[in-house]
């Protein structure tokens, strides 16, 4: 009987392990950054993430959620769903993040923020996104 319970527990653990992790998966590759954005790095100082959190809360959190996981209340109706920024920031350079925030993402509901946010505000959001975890 003990052997049977052990086998059931082990099999259950494998099933749970196989089902986990889907929510934080990201695309295998990111789109290439256009030449006019490639190589850009954040010019702002260490306090930029604090200011970026405020900008993110007002402008990004409705879709991306408070932790950037793509689970904001406005994002639930979107197709495709907003990206998990904690995962994306691990894959992307500052240039990619600045580009996507500035110009949006075709085929998604990610709108361009260039002209709505200042360049410094976009860099502040980039700094804040760098603090997010998957």
Regions found by a protein language model. Name each.
Residues 1-4:
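Positively charged n-region of N-terminal signal peptides that target proteins for export
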Residues 15-18:
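C-terminal motif of bacterial Sec signal peptides marking the signal peptidase cleavage site
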Residues 24-55:
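Electrostatic cytochrome c docking/interface patches
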Residues 6-13:
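Sec-dependent N-terminal signal peptides
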Residues 69, 131-134:
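Inter-heme linker and motif-flanking segments adjacent to c-type heme-binding CXXCH motifs
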Residues 73-77:
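Short cysteine/histidine-rich zinc-coordinating motifs and their immediately flanking basic loops
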Residues 79-132:
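Extracytoplasmic electron-transfer domains, predominantly the class I c-type cytochrome c fold
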Residues 46-69, 97-99:
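Sequence/structural segment immediately N-terminal to covalent heme-attachment motifs in c-type
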